[in-house]
Amino acid sequence: MQRRIGLTGGIASGKSSVGRLLEARGWPVLDADQYARDALAPNTAASQAVAHHFGAAVGTAADLDRKALGRIVFSDPDQRRWLEALIHPVVRERFQHELAELRDEPVVVLMIPLLFEAGLDVLCSEIWLVDCTPKQQLERMIQRDGLTKNEAQNRLQAQWPIARKRDRADCVIDNSGGVNDLLAAVSRCGLRADGTTW
């Protein structure tokens, strides 16, 4: 049976760093964020729906202003739910297609920030949660994405509380330390119940 690892965590917790480690191990990593970006590529059905729904505030279907869209949806839960209802089915369909293509792989990683929120945990045989401190998340978002503290906090609040995700995870990867600590945590999660290593 294929081992399907759902890799999730809070925003700016370090999922991509863990994903790169697993990719270097030779495991295919399917990236929900990339699939969502692809769904909103110029002139797709989804980008046309977004341009129609939000109007000039987000540009045109040929040239969406993703930063403006982010500011809107992370400050208005109703608008965020509308966008998620549009994008999540497209992302789910892409995952199902990619999983069918990779059916002969022994291990596949599904990197999905909103794994539980989108109901995509049903595609996984196990869940790995990448965790760090809320302070680190805020600092990373402000530095990486150029967000204000308030914008970063809005994005944190748009996701399930990390404790709720932790309760549903099979393995928690603490990414609040250095690179060596992260490698050790990933290795621990990679151990199989039967003792074989990753």
Curated annotation (Swiss-Prot):
The molecular function terms in GO held by this entry are: ATP binding; dephospho-CoA kinase activity
Note the PROSITE patterns from the entry: DPCK (PS51219)
Question: Which pathway or pathways does this protein act in?
Answer: Cofactor biosynthesis; coenzyme A biosynthesis; CoA from (R)-pantothenate: step 5/5
**Biological processes annotated in GO:** coenzyme A biosynthetic process
A Gene Ontology cellular component where this protein is annotated is: cytoplasm
Which residues make up the binding site for ATP? A12, S13, G14, K15, S16, S17
Q: Name one Pfam family in it.
A: CoaE
Sections of the chain in a coiled coil: none
Enzyme class, UniProt record, top EC level: transferase
As its record notes, the protein acts as a catalyst of: 3'-dephospho-CoA + ATP = ADP + CoA + H(+)
Q: Which InterPro entries match?
A: Depp_CoAkinase (IPR001977), P-loop_NTPase (IPR027417)
CDD domains named among the record's database cross-references: DPCK
Q: Where is the DPCK domain?
A: 4-198
In the record, the note on similarity to other proteins reads: Belongs to the CoaE family.
Matching NCBIfam families, A to Z?
dephospho-CoA kinase
Protein name per UniProt: Dephospho-CoA kinase
Species of provenance: Parasynechococcus marenigrum (strain WH8102)
Q: What is the lineage of its organism?
A: Bacteria, Bacillati, Cyanobacteriota, Cyanophyceae, Synechococcales
* Gene behind this protein: coaE
